[in-house]
Amino acid sequence: MSYLSVSTWSLHRCLGPLHWTVWNESAGSHETVLQPEPQLFNLLELPALAKAKGYSAVEVCHFHMPDRSESYLADLRGAFHDAGLSFDTLLLDYGDLSSGDERRRQADFGLMMEWIDAASPA
């Protein structure tokens, strides 16, 4: 069955600040840097808006997720459920599992696993 989905990347100037992951070499860890963007609506409002426009699914970029707490993810899951919309993809647009720097490669792998754990309840 075919259906129409929209990616949050297509709306990246509407969802508020982008939460970019960067590598801090001296600390040997990831950090989040905010890039200001206008917020016309938030991620919790997106499922209902997308459904009203005829979409059946949303694909979310990790840098649009303002929070990975259990309560926020439960709210996000509820927003998708209430709208009757599918959360199809979580794009983790960061990490290099082929890095020659073992510390960085392990940190990137760990970050990916954290995102998989965060996406599971959503």
Q: What do these predicted ranges mean?
A:
Residues 1-121:
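N-terminal pre-domain/capping segments
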